[in-house]
UniProtKB/Swiss-Prot annotation:
Protein name: Envelope glycoprotein H
Origin superkingdom: Viruses
Taxonomic source organism: Human herpesvirus 1 (strain 17)
Membrane topology according to the record: Single-pass type I membrane protein
Intravirion side: 825-838
Signal sequence region: 1-18
Gene Ontology BP term (one): fusion of virus membrane with host plasma membrane
Role description: The heterodimer glycoprotein H-glycoprotein L is required for the fusion of viral and plasma membranes leading to virus entry into the host cell. Following initial binding to host receptor, membrane fusion is mediated by the fusion machinery composed of gB and the heterodimer gH/gL. May also be involved in the fusion between the virion envelope and the outer nuclear membrane during virion morphogenesis.
Post-translational modification: N-glycosylated, O-glycosylated, and sialylated.
Pfam families given in the database record: Herpes_glycoH_C, Herpes_glycop_H
Length: 838
């Protein structure tokens, strides 16, 4: 080296001597002297301040031997990303006293050059005293980057030249919530700890799981070691560049995304980094670290004062939460409130099930039905609870050293279900663009578990007959989320839905939790193939039939009962001892093609079934409307309609009719009836008579053709057929509507017994799903587009006469009779008198 040249600093020494279990920090001694020097350097005055180190040219030895390895592909574009680490090398950044005019050299030294060298005799002998072993920290901010002006310029330029992620830190500095952890309740006052394995309980390997273990899933324990990802070293980079990189021991990741949003949660030992971004809102980030840890904020490079910590609530007994976002106090208050609530979730419990239960309830919250389209505050709350449930699940599993089989399957199933609800119901995602992945299992163990679950699904479908186990088989296929699993259970799921529909037509009320759960997962596995691409003809036919039967199961009475059941369940759930699991309260209306459940007539029906309560009428009406709107949006997948009912979205002349369908009835493989409040320009149209002119109903038979015509509905008392064995009604749909414009039912005639029942007409005193005591009109829709009016099934209004009116009428008749009798008596007395005068 020349006399005028002296080297002064190393910001990061990326050396890994075997298994290193700690992060070390070194501060350049001249750091404080160089605080103001970073303002002097500009790499590109057109785009702003950007510092980049020089790298040797590999083609120019001898310095070229220290060039970055080719696999890193370090360029001026990739250098700012700080992806400098390579396992076979250690990197050294060398700067001079001329910094920042001289940006320094980034050199790479192969580790083989450093290992096995003889000791340097000029250096003092190493001490023989072994240092006291310290446990590796769970979270370690890499302050080496903070304490070097060169790195500070790089990170600050990225945070402040590109964008300012936290323009108003005071808006994100808020007090702790009411239900977060305290000194007396370090896990939160409402926390219900997850179950722990009993002393001596056996840990079952996943390769030995059988149906008996599924029967006893709540007492079957799996060892965490080998099943979940082992904690590994990882450098977490804040996407907003608002803080410095953080060294963590990662345990997995949760990712949810679609065409309109992306959520990514990185889990670690006592760490979570959650990023939520949407097309309709600025991105937000939540970082959870141990209580004694602090994350420094990246400050303005023009500010001589060092920046403080990231904003967020004060630290708790176990964790400290930091909140990042571009929200200001002038923004929408609901967005700030939602972000504050998300920041409190990690300190409100340790049980994943409580967070999933709260997320399901949040989906049906009052503002869930307030408006259509994306709702960032609701999406933030849903995904915040979803991510926190994963954080709690992983932490509890590692802390206990074991995980319950029912908890493992429950977490995987409910998190997937909630991800779909959040994406479609709150973010406005297209249904066929949603993707979801939870990477908390060891890759090898995951493959073994999936293979075993696939085998158990096949065994359940082959051997078992109970509805509960079949529902569990569909749930396992839903967890596996693979085409082979869906194809394996699809025939059984379709048969189950047909069987439940037959019981419904026979008068059985399908209200038990196991029936709801079976319908939920059976409907899910039949609808799922369209997400993987274009469904096959068999998949489309199964899905169309399941949608038709779900619509048939969703009568007006069922819709009102569903609303009442959800209200009761939500009011009863405390998310501690009583949890709210949506599949146990699933309604076929949510998987149907009925989009009219939020209309006023249905709201009144639901309110009529409400039990006595102290809840004000206005609040009850708002809750009822919110639940109905949520059910309608849940069912209304535009992508699902395009995939399975393409004739309903067929465009003619380059444009589709701007008419919102109220009900779709896929009656054949390529034709559907649609109910609307306005006429459609194509198809065979019928105007339904006897309906309030303010809410008219139009029925249209649609195919892929663009021709349009209108017909009149033919009236018949009963269907007359020539062949008593085959009445020709199988495949038709029985539809009933009221004068108020409410479609009460659309029932599929799918068996000979059902068609015989319709041909015979209603029976006095015999209850039937085809009868009603509400004034209404009955139609029969045929697969060929013909519609007839079944007069025998109509219900005519009966005049209601008050008892007082009847008594007054009877008294009037008696008085009139008495008056007539008196007149006759007078006449009889007077007639002889007239005769005498003559």
């Amino acid at each position: 080296m020349g006399n005028g040249l002296w080297f002064v600093g190393v910001i990061i020494l990326g050396v890994a001597w075997g298994q290193v279990h700690d992060w070390t920090e070194q501060t350049d001694p001249w750091f404080l002297d160089g605080l103001g020097m970073d303002r002097m350097y500009w790499r590109d005055t057109n785009t702003g301040r950007l510092w980049l180190p020089n790298t040797p040219d590999p083609q120019k030895p001898p310095r070229g031997f220290l060039a970055p390895p080719d696999e890193l592909n370090l360029t001026t574009a990739s250098l700012p990303l700080l992806r400098w680490y390579e396992e076979r090398f250690c990197f050294v950044l060398v700067t001079t006293a001329e910094f920042p005019r001289d940006p320094g050299q980034l050199l790479y030294i192969p580790k083989t050059y450093l290992l096995g060298r003889p000791p340097n005799a000029s250096l003092p002998a190493p001490t023989t005293v072994e240092p006291t072993a310290q446990p590796p920290p769970s979270v370690a901010p890499l302050k080496g980057l903070l304490h070097n002006p060169a790195a500070s310029v790089l990170l600050r330029s990225r945070a402040w030249v590109t964008f300012s992620a936290v323009p108003d830190p005071e808006a994100l500095t808020f007090p702790r919530g009411d239900n977060v952890a305290t000194a007396s309740h370090p896990s939160g006052p409402r926390d219900t700890p997850p179950p722990r394995p009993p002393v001596g309980a056996r840990r079952h390997p996943t390769t030995e799981l059988d149906i008996t273990h599924l029967h006893n899933a709540s007492t079957t324990w799996l060892a965490t070691r080998g099943l979940l990802r082992s904690p590994g070293r990882y450098v977490y980079f804040s996407p907003s560049a608002s803080t410095w990189p953080v060294g963590i021991w990662t345990t997995g990741e949760l990712v949810l995304g679609c065409d309109a949003a992306l959520v990514r949660a990185r889990y670690g030992r006592e760490f979570m980094g959650l990023v939520i971004s949407m097309h309709d809102s600025p991105p937000v980030e939540v970082m959870v670290v141990p209580a004694g840890q602090t994350l420094d904020r990246v400050g303005d490079p023009a500010d001589e004062n060092p920046p403080g910590a990231l904003p967020g609530p004060p630290g708790g007994p176990r964790y400290r939460v930091f909140v990042l976002g571009s929200l200001t106090r002038a923004d929408n208050g609901s967005a700030l409130d939602a972000l504050r609530r998300v920041g409190g979730y990690p300190e409100e419990g340790t049980n994943y099930a409580q967070f999933l239960s709260r997320a399901y309830a949040e989906f049906f919250s009052g503002d869930a039905g307030a408006e259509q389209g994306p709702r960032p505050p609701l999406f933030w709350r849903l995904t915040g609870l979803l991510a926190t449930s994963g954080f709690a699940f992983v932490n509890a599993a590692h802390a206990n050293g074991a995980v319950c089989l029912s908890d493992l399957l429950g977490f995987l199933a409910h998190s997937r279900a909630l991800a779909g609800l959040a994406a479609r119901g709150a973010a406005g995602c297209a249904a066929d663009s949603v993707f979801f992945n939870v990477s908390v299992l060891d890759p090898t163990a995951r493959l073994q578990l999936e293979a075993r679950l696939q085998h158990l699904v096949a065994e359940i479908l082959e051997r078992e007959q109970s509805l509960a186990l079949h529902a569990l088989g569909y749930q396992l296929a839903f967890v596996l989320d693979s085409p082979s699993a869906y194809d394996a259970v699809a025939p059984s799921a379709a048969h189950l839905i047909d069987a439940l529909y037959a019981e419904f037509l026979g008068g059985r009320v399908l209200t038990t939790p196991v029936v709801h759960r079976a319908l939920f997962y059976a409907s899910a596995v039949l609808r799922q193939p369209f997400l993987a691409g274009v469904p096959s003809a068999v998949q489309r036919e199964r899905a169309r039939r399941s949608l038709l039967i779900a619509s048939a199961l969703c009568t007006s009475d069922v819709a009102a009962a569903t609303n009442a059941d959800l209200r009761t369940a939500l009011a009863r759930a405390d998310h501690q001892k009583t949890l709210f699991w949506l599949p146990d309260h699933f309604s076929p209306c949510a998987a149907s093609l009925r989009f009219d459940l939020d209309e006023s007539v249905f709201i009144l029906d639901a309110l009529a079934q409400a039990t006595r309560s102290e809840t004000p009428v206005e609040v009850l009406a708002q809750q009822t409307h919110g639940l109905a709107s949520t059910l309608t949006r849940w069912a209304h997948y535009n992508a699902l309609i395009r995939a399975f009912v393409p004739e309903a979205s067929h465009r003619c002349g380059g444009q589709s009719a701007n008419v919102e369908p109220r009900i779709l009835v896929p009656i054949t493989h390529n034709a559907s009836y649609v109910v609307t409040h306005s006429p459609l320009p194509r198809g065979i149209g019928y105007k339904l008579t006897g309906v309030d002119v303010r809410r008219p109903l139009f029925l249209t038979y649609l195919t892929a053709t663009c021709e349009g015509s209108t017909r009149d509905i033919e009236s018949k008392r009963l269907v007359r057929t020539q062949n008593q064995r085959d009445l020709g009604l199988v495949g038709a749909v029985f539809m009933r509507y009221t004068p108020a414009g409410e479609v009460m039912s659309v029932l599929l005639v799918d068996t000979d017994n059902t068609q015989q029942q319709i041909a015979a007409g209603p029976t006095e005193g015999a209850p039937s799903v085809f009868s009603s005591d509400v004034p209404s009109t009955a139609l029969l829709l045929f697969p060929n587009g013909t519609v007839i009016h079944l007069l025998a099934f109509d219900t005519q209004p009966v005049a209601a006469i008050a008892p007082g009116f009847l008594a007054a009428s009877a008294l009037g008749v008696v008085m009139i009779t008495a008056a007539l009798a008196g007149i006759l008596k007078v006449l009889r007395t007077s007639v002889p008198f007239f005769w005498r005068r003559e």
